[in-house]
């Protein structure tokens, strides 16, 4: 997949338009709409912005840039176009359509969600886009909102679910487990002394941190998936303060310091709490491991 930080000149494209910040099942429906009959020869592309206003309102990331690129590539996208918003912010909807989508990107098919807005002051909507496409003689697919629980799927709903620890609902709206691939950093090695060696990972400042607590998780190491127990929070029993992800990979004992490891959250098991002793903590961890093995079984294949 080619990635462009400026608007390139392309030929014969089918383009999905939108925010695509989490690439949830609603975003995926828009991307899949590019697969129209008689459009197989078009190069599939996604057009968004690297710094759109929607990204600047304190909305933490639910998928890293690298993960989004991987997902789009797996979906068959050949070009990801991410110019700075300021480069086109003063274009009217009609000018954006004619100068950018047609003039530079040679769009032959456009797809968007029903709530899509474009152009200066977000004056253009999906209805206008459909009309402009008809006038130009190119295809246009406006995808209805995908519903979950009678309400449209949205990144804000996913963030709310994760903030409440409801990773199962978040996974249904994402179309995949919520996961993060972060560098393993040095910790206090308390887990190793307890017989449950753990990996510590620090969340980036702009990444969403799920509700504090203990999760059944799946951790991937060198292409192998292991059941695991992940604590997200501040480890109150041992007096830690900075929030991080600490994971015991069940059945793996290798050294992962300095490596990037993916952890996927399967199910929330219990709130983070302070135990009266290290022995009580150790017993709780082993109890958590038994639950996690059962909860993650279907995700290890």
Please annotate each region the language model reported.
Residues 12, 187-301:
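Phosphate/ribose-recognition catalytic cores of enzymes acting on nucleotide-derived substrates
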Residues 53-136:
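N-terminal Rossmann-like or analogous alpha/beta NTP/dinucleotide-binding catalytic cores
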Residues 24, 72, 110, 170, ...:
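Residue-level signal for inorganic ion chemistry
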Residues 9-12, 87-90, 147-151:
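A short acidic, often aromatic-flanked loop/helix-cap motif at beta-alpha or helix-coil junctions
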Residues 1-8, 81:
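Short acidic-hydrophobic, aromatic-tinged amphipathic segments that line or gate anion-handling sites
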Residues 6-65:
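N-terminal catalytic cores of NTP/NDP-binding nucleotidyl/phosphoryl-transfer enzymes
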Residues 133-231:
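Glycine-rich, Lys/Arg-enriched anion-binding loops that position phosphate/diphosphate groups
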